[in-house]
Curated annotation (Swiss-Prot):
This protein's encoding gene: modSP
Domain Peptidase S1, first and last residues per copy: 369-621
Major location (coarse): secreted
This protein's name: Modular serine protease
Single GO BP term: receptor guanylyl cyclase signaling pathway
List of catalytic residues: 414, 472, 563
Site (Cleavage): 368-369
Enzyme class, broadest EC rank: hydrolase
Source organism of the structure: Drosophila melanogaster
Keyword Glycoprotein: yes
Glycosylation sites: 36, 204, 376, 621
Amino acid sequence: MQLISFLSNPLFFCALLLKFRTIFAACDSSQFECDNGSCISQYDVCNGEKNCPDGSDETALTCVSQRQHCTKPYFQCTYGACVIGTAGCNGVNECADGSDETRLRCGNEDDIRQHDRRLQGNCKENEFKCPSGICLDKSNFLCDGKDDCADGTGFDESVELCGHMECPAYSFKCGTGGCISGSLSCNGENDCYDGSDEAPLLCNTTKKVTTPVVTETPLELLGCPLPLGDERPILTGDGSRVLTGPITRGTVRFSCKQGYVLEGEESSYCAKNKWSTSTIPKCVKYCSTAGEFDGYSTKALCTHNGQQVECRKPFHPPGTEVKFVCSTGFKTLSPLPEMRCMKGGYWNRGRQRCEQDCGQLATPIKQFSSGGYTINNTVVPWHVGLYVWHNEKDYHFQCGGSLLTPDLVITAAHCVYDEGTRLPYSYDTFRVIAAKFYRNYGETTPEEKRRDVRLIEIAPGYKGRTENYYQDLALLTLDEPFELSHVIRPICVTFASFAEKESVTDDVQGKFAGWNIENKHELQFVPAVSKSNSVCRRNLRDIQADKFCIFTQGKSLACQGDSGGGFTSELPTNAFSTWNTARHFLFGVISNAPNADQCAHSLTVMTNIQHFEDMILNAMNRSVETRS
């Protein structure tokens, strides 16, 4: 990755070469000398890619002086490198410090809110929590150039927290993004945590500058040295007795609190202010995976030092990289950005979700002799069976339903409602089965998957038979999401404008799924056509306002076991949609329920989902926000 545009400015190019030749004279005039003595081409310096073996060509000390020369259309990394203009938030780390892909630069509103909550921890509003646990005021101590957390990690001056910031024109931007007074640059003292305000190329000097010294407390000057802050291990002596310090003599065992891992020996002997081991043990903060990788819309692949590691571990060391791909049944228009565990034990960005790919089906169908179509599960992959256990030996079939998200089912309220108590049945008496080909609970196929129910939500106005099944609609949240496949997919929903909500129009060609009443009760779908509420009233004068009806076509029937199932229709998608094919959409839920082994020969009453937009969308949004 070379930025040959600098060649278009010969005066800049000659001046830059002269500076490099003056300060790094060991290499020839067309080369840059790395800190380890290696020589690389001048054109490979400050281009976002580490070309020196030690990476010294991509540091703030080397690159911060080039900032004024990096203008649009190029993108300027926080430490000063100049890279391709599309680098910002394209999912690829073009900058050596990752400043083009930080969470605060690229994250959505949810990512930023989550980041702010974690940064605040249990501190007050407008404060942030250091790794050591102390709370500091954001406006005074965050990204001010100083290591105010004083733990040696520069946490409050990190690129992740400060790299996205814009500094005022009168100030100087440090190599990690913090802002200091412009008068402090090149004053002979390091006022930026990374020393970038005294960079040799910026200040035209080669002498070492002084760094303010943090005076250690007298306690730490006595006895064997120990790390400060959260890096300090838990010290125990004989009999697991916790030691405080100073440690002047004796054998000490080291351990760390949860979330930290010990680097160094587990025990050492202290004498004459020195440990018997060559390195001082310290605790390193690892990145927690709690809530980071979880989500049914993506799958994660974790690596550390180039080796694949188990993502399910509760903590990962700094340097761990996580790649994501969309789960089956989900998609994205651009590659998902990677996550990295940073020094200090935090992730550089949040996980990005994929979009649900609903309403898709596959495989041909064959005609069923009675007028319905016996089908492969892929033809109605959103259709599920609802089974109940009421003081019996096993579950028995109750109703059908439709999958809205991997963990949310829509069905009829009367399927889960106790007319005697006027309350829903207990959620733990139900079980949902997806990809169910045979209706009987005990007749299974390898494709079917089972989930328990953890929450039942019934439409607030539902009163059962007393109100003639008005608002006959319920949502079931599952204890665990289904893993989507070619036989398990959610149905699409869309909601019309206010004026169009009152009724489904006439003659919408669609179908509903159920299990036939013959032989093994195999899965089938029934073709049908819709009729508006006003047309339905000619046959059913007491039909409620939230209903429409469908007429089954041919000899096909709607039977008792079809209650709760969905009437769906294939529709073309919007030309501006990210979908490029027709999709199947849910129009209504079967409400009327003939007696067992009876079927409706004429019309079937449906609950129109358009009357429940808030209820449905709120539940779907909860699923996406908490579990996708």
